[in-house]
């Protein structure tokens, strides 16, 4: 089998920064991309790209997150006889969506090159939709929906392809599987018009996501990036809602990428900056034996992360995402407490 990546010791230079210990005389040069000497710089970068767990070591990752989304839409239903003179109804919709979650993940290093990960979450969602119709007088209607419960359980495996010898980037292959344990959009109760009476806590579909990420040291930072393809598995719903017969539904697959860098200010504190983008393909739904497709989505977000090493076993991480495209959530914040054993 492939030899494990070379282990590299590290020392603190006069500026307080981590640097590899020089190799003994006659030994091959130490690979500058060795991840073990870069844990401080890598601690703040997004999950799924960061350094693998050490062989035989277990860690728990406790986290809480909050996501805020809002959308505004102005619709005119009528005719415009001359520019600026409209006959009909003006309808304005405003939707505010809040999602919070508590997550727990267990990570274990099978070898120095391979890590497995299992995670579960409890999700609470709340949507407030306000509709204003303007004809002779304004008519306002507000709808509040909520839902909470177990989310979709996920499992993943990551494998370090190379050791970063001769200054090359370290490449890591990953495979993630997402279950449908959460209550999906076709599992929740609906009224006689097919309108949901509460919110889903899961997608309702299984999915798999292969990915490749890289880590490339460029002193004093470490550059990171990833590409991924998330494939949903289609499902035959086979039920009638609001007078419409729902057949097979195939949620749109997603192509994702990210790029950024991590920087260690001292042995305890590091931060990261990055950008991630996903192109979500149209969802196809079979309604009354007619296949309809939704629009595709472009979801982009700026990322900012911070990490502080509390003790040898505990660290505190905070990650922010700010949406920069119309389809992206406005803001997402994740507070994580990794615990090493």
Q: For each predicted feature, which ranges?
A:
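Residues on the lipid-exposed face of transmembrane beta-strands in outer-membrane beta-barrel proteins
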Residues: 49, 60, 64, 104-108, ...
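Residues that define the transmembrane beta-barrel architecture of outer-membrane proteins
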Residues: 56, 98-102, 147-153, 169, ...
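Structural signature of outer-membrane beta-barrel domains
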Residues: 65-71, 115-119, 123-127, 176-184, ...
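Short loop/turn motifs that connect adjacent beta-strands in outer-membrane beta-barrel proteins
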Residues: 48-56, 71-73, 113, 163-171, ...
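Residue-level detector of the transmembrane beta-barrel scaffold of outer-membrane proteins
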Residues: 57-61, 73, 115-117, 156, ...
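Outer membrane beta-barrel transmembrane domains
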Residues: 73-83, 236-341
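Outer-membrane pore/translocation modules
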Residues: 124-244, 250, 293-294
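Outer-membrane beta-barrel biogenesis signature
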Residues: 1-82, 183-185
């Amino acid at each position: 089998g492939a030899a494990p990546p070379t282990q590299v010791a590290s020392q603190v230079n006069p500026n307080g920064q981590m640097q590899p210990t020089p190799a003994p005389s006659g030994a091959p040069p130490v690979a500058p991309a060795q991840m073990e000497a870069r844990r401080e710089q890598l601690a703040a970068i997004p999950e799924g790209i960061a350094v693998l767990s050490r062989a035989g070591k277990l860690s728990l990752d406790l986290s809480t997150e909050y996501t805020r989304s809002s959308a505004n839409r102005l619709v005119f239903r009528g005719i415009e006889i001359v520019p600026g003179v409209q006959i009909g109804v003006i309808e304005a919709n405003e939707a505010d969506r809040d999602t919070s979650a508590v997550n727990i993940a267990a990570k274990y290093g099978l070898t120095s090159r391979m890590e497995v990960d299992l995670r579960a979450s409890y999700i609470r969602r709340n949507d407030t939709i306000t509709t204003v119709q303007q004809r002779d007088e304004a008519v306002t209607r507000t709808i509040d929906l909520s839902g909470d419960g177990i989310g979709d359980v996920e499992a993943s495996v990551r494998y370090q392809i190379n050791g970063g010898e001769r200054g090359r980037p370290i490449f890591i292959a990953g495979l993630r599987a997402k279950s449908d344990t959460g209550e999906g959009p076709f599992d929740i109760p609906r009224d006689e018009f097919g309108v949901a009476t509460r919110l889903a806590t899961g997608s309702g579909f299984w999915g798999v996501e292969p990915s490749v990420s890289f880590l490339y040291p460029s002193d004093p930072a470490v550059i990171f990036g990833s590409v991924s393809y998330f494939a949903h598995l289609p499902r035959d719903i086979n039920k009638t809602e609001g007078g419409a017969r729902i057949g097979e539904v195939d949620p749109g697959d997603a192509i994702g990428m990210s790029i950024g860098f991590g920087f260690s200010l001292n042995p305890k504190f590091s931060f990261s900056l990055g950008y991630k983008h996903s192109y979500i393909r149209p969802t196809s739904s079979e309604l009354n034996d007619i296949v309809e497709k939704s629009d595709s989505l472009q979801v982009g977000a700026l990322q900012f992360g911070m990490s502080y090493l509390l003790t040898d076993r505990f660290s505190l991480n905070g990650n922010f995402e700010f949406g920069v495209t119309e389809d992206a959530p406005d803001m997402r914040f994740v507070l994580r407490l990794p615990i090493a054993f």
